[in-house]
Amino acid sequence: MRGLFKSKPRTPADIVRQTRDLLLYADRSNSFPDLRESKREEKMVELSKSIRDLKLILYGNSEAEPVAEACAQLTQEFFKADTLRRLLTSLPNLNLEARKDATQVVANLQRQQVNSRLIAADYLESNIDLMDFLVDGFENTDMALHYGTMFRECIRHQIVAKYVLDSEHVKKFFYYIQLPNFDIAADAAATFKELLTRHKSTVAEFLIKNEDWFFADYNSKLLESTNYITRRQAIKLLGDILLDRSNSAVMTKYVSSMDNLRILMNLLRESSKTIQIEAFHVFKLFVANQNKPSDIANILVANRNKLLRLLADIKPDKEDERFDADKAQVVREIANLKLRELA
């Protein structure tokens, strides 16, 4: 008879609903601090356990792989109501382990398909203000790394990345990348890179529309930063952007600017070999441009001897045939350049 009274195992949807109820309670208890502390602690322990259970369903463990049907049920219930919004806003109330678990849950859910559809993308499109919340999370020292991870996973969806690129949020990353907290600055840099490289057509459209202010800020705030790490990351990312075929129109305009060329020539003179090599990969685009404006060609001619001496000293630590071939081609081009009449 005892077996008749055993509680039914909770379904994935049950666990999501319980999590949602506990998140509601957590919000309420913060609004009403008079609620009994022991009761609150008990509920927060339950909430942490529920979030851990969600993670277990989505990721499995050492003994069992995740079950596709259970993951689909969980995902469907999670995005049916405002569970994501409640989880994000309640994150500061959780302990560190629960925050980590919640971050992993949100990250995983961005990849979960239900009936061959990423329903997280549909939810975020209808609740796009959550991206405003996540971006501003970089300013919260305790929460930045959690919100940053979630933000990167959310911009896997092209519609979400487009919203961020079309907003004023992009400008905030020039500041976040240089925050004094090294871990947060590095996380912001990783996020900025993801935003500018993942969705090729969306990024190309953004750069064409915003190239004037974007590259002016990129040059002054990142490439000319006093911070070595910022300069190193920025010149590497610039190379990734300009060498991508999707951005060929933007690249052609970038390498037609005297101001841009001066900045690159300064980076070639850096004491850091890493920065020199990354700068070379962008500098070679100025030299290789078959339709150089006269002022660009004339600067290269006027500085020919200095540039050739500089290039002779730039060598990667490991033998790199491709780099050597590129450098030889650049040296030949510079050696053969002639002064032109300015248009």
Swiss-Prot record:
Q: Which domain of life is it from?
A: Eukaryota
User: Would you tell me the Gene Ontology cellular component terms?
Assistant: cytosol
Family matches, as Pfam families: Mo25 (PF08569)
InterPro entries associated with the record: ARM-like (IPR011989), ARM-type_fold (IPR016024), Mo25 (IPR013878)
Q: Where are the transmembrane segments?
A: none
**The family this protein is said to belong to:** Belongs to the Mo25 family.
Q: What protein name is recorded for this chain?
A: Putative MO25-like protein At4g17270
